[in-house]
Design a protein with these regions (language model features):
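Compositionally biased, intrinsically disordered low-complexity regions enriched for acidic
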Residues: 14-101, 105, 117, 135-158
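Short linear, low-complexity motifs centered on an aromatic residue
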Residues: 113-137
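Charge-patterned, phosphorylation-rich low-complexity C-terminal interaction regions
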Residues: 160-168
Length: 168
């Protein structure tokens, strides 16, 4: 009897995993993608140490770069919260988070997406990644007094770099 119950439980779990996976695959990722900040606003506030796209900004609207401080190399003073937040590019590559379509990462994808480019399989991957980042927003809301920008500065910088409003 124990073996049957265990097998039934395992089969039920596998069935639930399949159902959940199917639901996730059928989600309209474009409907759930609701970034709170535009690329322009993110850069105005200060992200990625001011080192955007290796200074190759020609494919993006010039208006995005008004009131934006740009640096040839990463400069932590240009980040909104004056902290380093995130992992190295090498780590991104090792984790498989860099794709040939956007070799500079999520922000490059997001800028191109905002400019109208659609590559469905890439959009799905990047929107899933963006959605998973919401946990950091929830951590700030749970652990910080509203408006205390000194609380969890690294997480605030991180959510800013994922188009979430850090002023919570």
């Amino acid at each position: 009897i124990k073996i049957c119950i265990k097998n039934l439980s395992t089969n039920k779990n596998n069935l639930m995993k399949k159902i959940i996976k199917k639901k996730v695959e059928n989600l309209d990722f474009y409907k759930i993608f609701k970034p709170e900040l535009t690329p322009k606003r993110m850069m105005e506030l200060g992200v990625f140490g001011g080192a955007y796209f290796g200074l190759n900004v020609k494919e993006y609207p010039k208006s995005w770069f008004k009131n934006v401080k740009i640096s040839k190399t990463f400069d932590v003073k240009l980040n909104r919260f004056k902290v380093i937040s995130g992992l190295s590019r090498q780590h991104w590559i090792e984790k498989g988070w860099i794709f040939k379509e956007d070799p500079l990462g999520w922000f490059q994808w997001y800028c191109r997406f905002c400019n109208g480019r659609r590559i469905v399989h890439m959009d799905k991957i990047q929107i899933k990644r963006w959605k998973n980042f919401r946990r950091h927003v929830l951590a700030i809301e749970k652990n910080c007094e509203k408006g205390d920008l000194g609380c969890r500065k690294r997480q605030r910088q991180a959510i800013l770099q994922w188009a979430y409003d850090p002023y919570r």
